[in-house]
Amino acid sequence: MLSEALLVSAPGKVILHGEHAVVHGKVALAAALNLRTFLLLRPQSNGKVSVNLPNIGIKQVWDVGMLQRLDTSFLEQGDVSVPTLEQLEKLKKMGDLPRDRAGNEGMALLAFLYLYLAICRKQRTLPSLDMVVWSELPPGAGLGSSAAYSVCLAAALLTACEEVSNPLKDGVSVSRWPEEDLKSINKWAFEGERVIHGNPSGVDNAVSTWGGALRFQQGTMSSLKSLPSLQILLTNTKVPRSTKALVAAVRSRLTKFPEIVAPLLTSIDAISLECERVLGEMVAAPVPEQYLVLEELIDMNQHHLNALGVGHNSLDQLCQVTAAHGLHSKLTGAGGGGCGITLLKPGLEQATVEAAKQALTSCGFDCWETSIGAPGVSTHSAAAVGDPVRQALGL
């Protein structure tokens, strides 16, 4: 059982190409974003389980004895169990979750409670733990924040209960789990995502578990063997949108104009495949011409997405502002607001990037200069993370 503090992190994700087309059987490329969620798990001896999520202002404490007495017969011994709505409603009541915690806040607590009971149930007595989670990812922006949370939960609880080994050895600052353990972490993280979202695709938790980049088509995922280091500007327009409504709108447009929209989806598929090919070539020795191709693909895909009807004035503004500084941008995810990505090719003057960031910020947007192809779920020594993370986690 856990005898000392455990610090884990997992990345968010962006869709490079293929959003919306993937719903219709086309290829999508998703990459791990180097903005991460961090989880600190400490053993306690006070008979309590405490969860602190400072990003969203949640602190919850349970008595281990009360949790021990819960009827968890629906959690089948030894298997990754699929929660039903009835079971989750029962768990909400049994776990005494605050009624004023609605939406994603309540779901975050419920996901913890579900995974804690499901993973730790083999222990003779449930462990007394203190958990703090802090994220660099904005919630609800389509960047995989809930998946990063679920992956951190799964990795930390499985390690604490010795279902997977702790890969961090003395003198090592960062380490990752072996492949078999990553598969187990991903399976449990997917169940956490089920609790939060009901019917997730599994893409977000897979990207957060393995990192790098994934190719996704018709339910089949495969890892891009390698990915060149790509710097991006990530912009959150902060315009809320409904993924479900946008997906339905594209489907409606396809039904109404099949001979127009079907070729658009086929063309987006070709953009994804061309991007995959170019990225593969860039791994060995990238040349300037390849970045120009990536920029062209970004521009073409953005126009295609506008033609599908998933653009937004805020995203047009993002593209226009960055274009004024010689940069190329597209929406990422569902569209209709949300986030966009801008490629920052090597050799770009920092003054240009800063000017673009300032212009975007003056539009009311949030910006991060970051990279894609980040490592997946990892465990760290306290010294390996930056001061803001240590401060947020109370290290």
From Swiss-Prot:
Gene3D superfamilies: 3.30.230.10, GHMP kinase, C-terminal domain. GO terms for biological process: cholesterol biosynthetic process; isopentenyl diphosphate biosynthetic process, mevalonate pathway; negative regulation of inflammatory response. It is an enzyme of class 2 (transferase). It holds the Pfam family GHMP_kinases_N. The active site is at S146 (proton donor), D204 (proton acceptor). One of its GO terms (molecular function) is magnesium ion binding. Keywords: ATP-binding, Cholesterol biosynthesis, Cholesterol metabolism, Cytoplasm, Kinase, Lipid biosynthesis, Lipid metabolism, Magnesium, Metal-binding, Nucleotide-binding, Peroxisome, Steroid biosynthesis, Steroid metabolism, Sterol biosynthesis, Sterol metabolism, Transferase. Farnesyl pyrophosphate and geranyl pyrophosphate inhibit mevalonate kinase activity by binding competitively at the ATP-binding sites. It catalyses: (R)-mevalonate + ATP = (R)-5-phosphomevalonate + ADP + H(+). Mg(2+) binds at S146, E193. The keyword Nucleotide-binding applies. It is found in: Cytoplasm; Peroxisome. Pathway: Isoprenoid biosynthesis; isopentenyl diphosphate biosynthesis via mevalonate pathway; isopentenyl diphosphate from (R)-mevalonate: step 1/3. One of its GO terms (cellular component) is cytosol. Its cofactor is Mg(2+). ATP binds at K13, N55, N104, S135, G140, A141, G142, L143, G144, S145, S146. Its main location: cytoplasm. Its EC number is 2.7.1.36. Catalyzes the phosphorylation of mevalonate to mevalonate 5-phosphate, a key step in isoprenoid and cholesterol biosynthesis. NCBIfam families: mevalon_kin. Belongs to the GHMP kinase family. Mevalonate kinase subfamily. Homodimer. This is Mevalonate kinase.
